[in-house]
């Protein structure tokens, strides 16, 4: 993922922001957000096996006025990466206008969608927002993807969404997000081939299947498809080595190396990280627009509507949360991409540690 960001935004301003963050963290023990993750609503129109977020009569949606106010604050503080997911974010009717506002204020804006609601009109509106990246969920070829998403034409809709975005939003990078399991390696290979033949410019990203409270499925701990034979760890390792060599796969090598350990049953794929630095460079917002350094590690905070997000982030209470979360282990044992990609690649000392560790894992 960082390769896409670097492709368009590796400039003097970006470098200065990175240098200042590292100086503040290493010498002063402080950190303000560089990335922001927004769960803009709490409903979804699919019935995915790995996620229990569903439709309901009264969905919660991040108030637009509050979101724009928060975007202003994040821009002032130097946030670079702003990602909107859900739920299913395209169920929010004024989503394009929100994305356009974010794109005017922040360098890199990213949207995650299942592609189910895509039309030519929506694709045009999204293309006009100025966002940099749209991720479409596709877990393999038609049969497997439809099974995973609980909708008989999910593949057809996602494929159509990719086509419409290519036509009507050509300046937006499209990335196919695929759940990685022991049951879909051949299906993912087939999908990658189909993408290369039809949309050669499309990228792929792999997300090891994880059960976690963020997806309302924390009580589950195994994934099993009746009548199907799972791939061995050696077969998964072979697939991952292929993915690392594929220039269209945007996962970092560090992340993919750890996925082998994850599928081998490791309960901690970050053993070299004795404390979590994630809260020092990230901020997340729930569907109500409540901020927290980490939705997994602590509950979002109710900040008064007239309060400044910037003042809150600079407050002693927020810094106390950052310090407390250093010892949090709630995401250990999982392989959530939204946490583990950044944790393995940032800050600099973690990137160096994970790089050496990844090479050692390959040798062993």
How does the language model describe each region?
Residues 34-37, 259-265, 283, 312-325:
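Short, intrinsically disordered, charge-biased short linear motifs at domain edges
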Residues 40, 44-45, 102, 176, ...:
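Generic structural signal for small/hydrophobic residues in well-ordered secondary structure
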Residues 87-88, 210, 333-336:
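Short, solvent-exposed turn/loop segments enriched in Gly/Ser/Thr/Pro and often Arg
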Residues 270-273, 277, 288-364:
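Flexible mid-to-C-terminal extensions adjoining Fe-S/redox cofactors in radical SAM and related proteins
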């Amino acid at each position: 993922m960082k390769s896409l960001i670097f492709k368009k935004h590796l400039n003097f301003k970006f470098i200065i922001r990175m240098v200042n963050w590292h100086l503040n963290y290493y010498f002063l023990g402080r950190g303000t957000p560089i990335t922001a993750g927004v769960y803009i609503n709490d409903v979804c129109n699919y019935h995915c096996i790995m996620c229990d977020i569903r439709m309901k009569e009264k969905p919660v949606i991040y108030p637009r006025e509050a979101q724009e106010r928060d975007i202003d604050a994040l821009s002032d503080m130097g946030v670079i990466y702003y990602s909107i997911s859900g739920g299913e974010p395209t169920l929010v009717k004024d989503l394009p206008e929100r994305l356009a506002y974010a794109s005017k204020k922040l360098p890199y804006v990213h949207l995650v969608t299942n592609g189910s609601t895509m039309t030519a009109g929506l694709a045009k509106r999204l293309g006009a927002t100025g966002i940099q990246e749209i991720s479409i969920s596709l877990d393999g070829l038609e049969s497997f993807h439809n099974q995973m998403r609980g909708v008989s034409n999910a593949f057809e809709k996602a494929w159509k969404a990719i086509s419409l975005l290519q036509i009507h939003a050509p300046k937006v990078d499209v990335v196919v997000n695929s759940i990685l399991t022991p049951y879909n390696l051949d299906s993912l290979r087939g999908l990658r081939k189909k993408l290369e033949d039809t949309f050669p410019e499309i990228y792929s990203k792999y997300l090891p299947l994880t059960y976690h409270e963020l997806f309302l499925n924390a009580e589950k701990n195994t994934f099993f498809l009746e009548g199907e034979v799972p791939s061995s760890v050696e077969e998964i390792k072979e697939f991952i080595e292929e993915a690392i060599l594929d220039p269209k796969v945007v996962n970092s090598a560090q992340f993919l190396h750890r996925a082998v350990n994850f599928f081998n049953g490791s309960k901690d794929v970050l053993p070299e990280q004795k404390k979590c630095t994630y809260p020092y460079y990230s901020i997340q917002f729930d569907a109500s627009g409540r901020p927290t350094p980490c939705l997994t590690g602590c509950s979002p905070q109710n900040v008064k509507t007239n309060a400044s997000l910037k003042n809150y982030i600079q407050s002693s209470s927020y810094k106390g949360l950052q310090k407390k979360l250093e010892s949090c282990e709630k995401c250990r044992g999982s392989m959530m991409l939204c946490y583990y990609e950044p944790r393995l690649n940032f800050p600099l000392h973690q990137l160096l540690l994970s790089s050496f560790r990844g090479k050692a894992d390959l040798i062993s």
